[in-house]
Amino acid sequence: MSEAEARPTNFIRQIIDEDLASGKHDHIQTRFPPEPNGYLHIGHAKSICLNFGIARDYQGQCNLRFDDTNPVKEDIEYVESIKRDVEWLGFSWSGDVRYSSDYFDQLHAYAVELIGKGLAYVDELTPEQIREYRGTLTAPGKNSPYRDRTVQENLALFEKMRNGGFAEGTACLRAKIDMASSFIVMRDPVLYRIKFADHHQTGNKWCIYPMYDFTHCISDALEGITHSLCTLEFQDNRRLYDWVLDNISIPCHPRQYEFSRLNLEYAIMSKRKLNQLVVENVVEGWDDPRMPTISGLRRRGYSASSIREFCVRIGVTKQDNNVEMAALESCIRDDLNENAPRAMAVLDPVKVVIENLPAGHEEFVAMPNHPNKPEMGSRQVAFSREVYIDRADFREEANKQYKRLVLGKEVRLRNAYVIKADRIEKDEQGTITTIYCSYDAETLSKDPADGRKVKGVIHWVSAAHAVPAEFRLYDRLFSVANPAAADDFLSTINPDSLKITQGFVEASLVQAEVEKAYQFEREGYFCADRVYSSAEHLVFNRTVGLRDTWVG
């Protein structure tokens, strides 16, 4: 299959194909325009993959433009995090990073042009009155008493706004369209508002800032964007997008196309609510591994390729739908099953003493780094008289369905020997502290010579060589599929979204690279935590289990 044949197809790509075939466009120019008021989440990844992917596949260009028109909510921290996320996902923007604030002078000039044409006016209604005058879906709005000011009055008042002559909230610039429009967005929308706040790019040069709907279309036009792609909630805004461009003297007129946003179950996609989780310390930060942010998913152990694959699988349509969390988890599970090296870790250890081995015994057994990829090589793992196994892998009594270690029965230690549990030792609380076993010396990576069948295989770590480690077992942050629908979304937090255990890993993991994925055999996929893990104190995050075991 050629690269072109392997491309995902969707209604947007079909439009682009038609535009190129008809000669409407001879090249493709897209953009990704996030507001730097928070970290990007998995929903933004869909837009990133769409916009940058189209530019890549059609040998076009994609700009990274920050929609930085609200200095009160924005921060350079978010700018830097967004750039990191886009690059980590595997994409490169065309030329320099762009900012809507780069165009503040042009935007101001276009606002003056609209005033000069009698298509914009300075309104002195309060924000509350503007909302009241706007009307509802079933009732038309009514005109502001300031709507019929002369062009000269409006030019003078807008200049007064520009010079700081009005207090915040006492004046704004509005488009003069139609207060009876069936589309509320067209009922004299606000174009400029006053904010006395330093801007992370322009400092204190401006005290008036353009609104999104005014800024977005003009920025697209100034950059020569051919296909302006946004999510469905901006569908009605397309009328204002076109109105602004139709009424100013700008040669380029991009077309806006809308696609469905990503709604992921057991997650929140609102940046306002995600910020609330951070501010109220429900999570440790924007990159908490339970967050649906790109940085959170990365820290948890998700690969960029798995997120890109997820975006391919869910596709691009005009129909809003909810995507199961299992679909995202399936992508990382498939990726890591194929590519993650194997290692052994015991998350809830109990000691096993092999009594028919001499004290101080040490040998090394060969273990493949991947059972299906010999090219990934193998490693030598220490085996000794004392090993740790997982507490869940032993029972004093069990039925035939239990294929692990049982008192008086045998099990195989993976890639090592068959052992038999002979006796146990407990503490005063009745907790098993030690399991005493014997081993069959003739069973190193082979069946017993007498033909007896040993069906169970468990993982282990040599006690003498084990490295202590902390394991952070992450699960879904919310206990219901649609937390946004709850009266108080915080009431749906999953109390078991993080469990921390102490155990051991094999010695090869002492130098584990941060965020490098491993399959801990029989446990799941893990990576060393970027924040907390060090050679002196290993901390591993569980990315996802070996299989989907969630019961909502």
From Swiss-Prot:
Transmembrane segments: none
EC numbers for this chain: 6.1.1.18
Presence of the UniProt keyword Cytoplasm in the record: yes
GO molecular function per UniProt: ATP binding; glutamine-tRNA ligase activity
Positions of L-glutamine binding: 67, 212
Keyword annotations from UniProtKB, A to Z: Aminoacyl-tRNA synthetase, ATP-binding, Cytoplasm, Ligase, Nucleotide-binding, Protein biosynthesis
Catalytic activity: tRNA(Gln) + L-glutamine + ATP = L-glutaminyl-tRNA(Gln) + AMP + diphosphate
Renumbered ranges of motif 'HIGH' region: 34-44
GO CC, any one term: cytosol
Record text on subunit structure and interactions: Monomer.
Name this protein carries in UniProt: Glutamine--tRNA ligase
Organism field: Pectobacterium atrosepticum (strain SCRI 1043 / ATCC BAA-672) (Erwinia carotovora subsp. atroseptica)
Species lineage: Bacteria, Pseudomonadati, Pseudomonadota, Gammaproteobacteria, Enterobacterales
